[in-house]
């Protein structure tokens, strides 16, 4: 499981506690440091990495991901643009049953870019299959 823009990493911590193999990522050094301390304090093992969506090679090397999570990521236009290009590459829907579902789950508080982002995905043939947005 991959969490993008993890911040404090609550979804990543919860998934790791349930036994998932987790990589939690963020651009902010402070967020990464806090998540590492929180995981250590709670005895949770997960991988943590500082990643820019404009330089996604480390994430793509580990793709395809069965599940990609994110929350409140679409607060800037550039985030929406970068994610629109990146998400289908991170979690492609495989035709092989053993390759995973390639599911993307995003929770957004209703920011303006979220609507445009969802419309872009709905316009693409694979959009509805790989993407769900909860506002």
Labelled PLM ranges:
Residues 1-135:
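S-adenosylmethionine-dependent methyltransferases
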């Amino acid at each position: 499981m991959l969490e993008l823009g993890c911040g404090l990493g609550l979804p990543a911590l919860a998934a790791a506690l349930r036994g998932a193999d987790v990589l939690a990522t963020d651009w902010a050094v402070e967020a990464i440091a806090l998540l590492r301390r929180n995981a250590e304090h709670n005895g949770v093992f997960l991988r943590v990495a500082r990643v820019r969506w404009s330089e996604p090679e480390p994430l793509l090397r580990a793709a395809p991901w069965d599940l990609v999570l994110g929350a409140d990521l679409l607060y800037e236009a550039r985030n929406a643009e970068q994610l629109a290009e990146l998400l289908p590459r991170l979690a492609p829907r495989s035709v092989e049953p053993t390759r995973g579902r390639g599911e993307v789950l995003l929770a957004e508080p209703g920011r303006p870019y979220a609507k445009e982002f969802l419309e872009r995905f709905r316009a693409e043939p694979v959009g509805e299959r790989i993407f769900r947005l909860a506002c």
